[in-house]
From Swiss-Prot:
The protein's name in its UniProt record: ATP synthase subunit b, chloroplastic
Annotated source species: Gnetum parvifolium
Annotated membrane topology: Single-pass membrane protein
GO cellular component: chloroplast thylakoid membrane; proton-transporting ATP synthase complex
Stretches that traverse the bilayer: 31-53
Pfam family, any one: ATP-synt_B
Subunit structure: F-type ATPases have 2 components, F(1) - the catalytic core - and F(0) - the membrane proton channel. F(1) has five subunits: alpha(3), beta(3), gamma(1), delta(1), epsilon(1). F(0) has four main subunits: a(1), b(1), b'(1) and c(10-14). The alpha and beta chains form an alternating ring which encloses part of the gamma chain. F(1) is attached to F(0) by a central stalk formed by the gamma and epsilon chains, while a peripheral stalk is formed by the delta, b and b' chains.
Known function: F(1)F(0) ATP synthase produces ATP from ADP in the presence of a proton or sodium gradient. F-type ATPases consist of two structural domains, F(1) containing the extramembraneous catalytic core and F(0) containing the membrane proton channel, linked together by a central stalk and a peripheral stalk. During catalysis, ATP synthesis in the catalytic domain of F(1) is coupled via a rotary mechanism of the central stalk subunits to proton translocation. Component of the F(0) channel, it forms part of the peripheral stalk, linking F(1) to F(0).
Family to which the UniProt record says this protein belongs: Belongs to the ATPase B chain family.
Origin superkingdom: Eukaryota
Misc note: In plastids the F-type ATPase is also known as CF(1)CF(0).
Subcellular localization, as worded in the UniProt entry: Plastid, Chloroplast thylakoid membrane
InterPro entries per the UniProt record, alphabetical: ATP_synth_b/b'su_bac/chlpt
Length: 185
């Protein structure tokens, strides 16, 4: 490579014969000179350009690999999230179903408790009514007994005199004697 570079340098120092040589003025150059310059640039710049392209290629390749790994990780996370979501949805449905069952059970329990309370209130009312009826009946009996006793005492005071009283005493004494002796009247 050094040999080619040296030969090109020597070509630039050759005395011009009038028609051949390197023109270093870019505006006065011709196609051959531009081709030669480009060829030299391509030949010597090929390694640098190749290295740059290889570096860029390896960076792109590693970026693609990283992206693919991240994509795989994201897919894996997405699958996990979907499975978790499905599990949570099943759990929510289960909780919802259990909630409805529990609500129905509590509703039935409340209806049952209300029915029991209503029956207890009805029984208590019936007992109270029965007790009050018995109390009224007892009060009426007491009043009737008291009034009958009052009438009997009044009758006794009015009807009984001493003579009737003595006769009654004698009669009862006679009965007691007869009992003692074994004779009954």
């Amino acid at each position: 490579m050094k040999g080619i570079a040296n030969s090109l340098i020597y070509l630039s120092y050759w005395p011009s014969a009038g028609s051949f040589g390197f023109n270093t003025n870019i505006l006065e150059t011709n196609i051959i000179n531009i081709t030669v310059v480009l060829g030299i640039l391509i030949y010597f710049g090929k390694g640098v350009l190749s290295n740059l392209l290889d570096n860029r290629k390896s960076k792109i390749y590693s970026t693609i690999q990283n992206s693919e790994e991240l994509c795989k990780g994201a897919r894996h996370q997405l699958e996990k999230a979907r499975a978790r979501l499905q599990e949570i949805e099943m759990r929510v449905d289960e909780i919802r179903a259990n909630g409805y069952l529990q609500i129905e059970q509590e509703k039935e329990d409340l209806v049952q408790a209300a029915s029991v309370n209503l029956k207890q209130l009805e029984d208590s009312k019936n007992e109270t009514v029965s007790f009050e009826q018995q109390k009224v009946i007892d009060q009426v009996r007491q009043q009737v007994s008291y009034q009958a006793l009052q009438k009997a005492l009044t009758f006794m005071k009015n009807c009984l005199n001493t003579e009737l009283h003595l006769r009654m005493i004698n009669y009862n004494i006679g009965r007691l004697r007869a009992k003692r002796t074994g004779q009954f009247l």
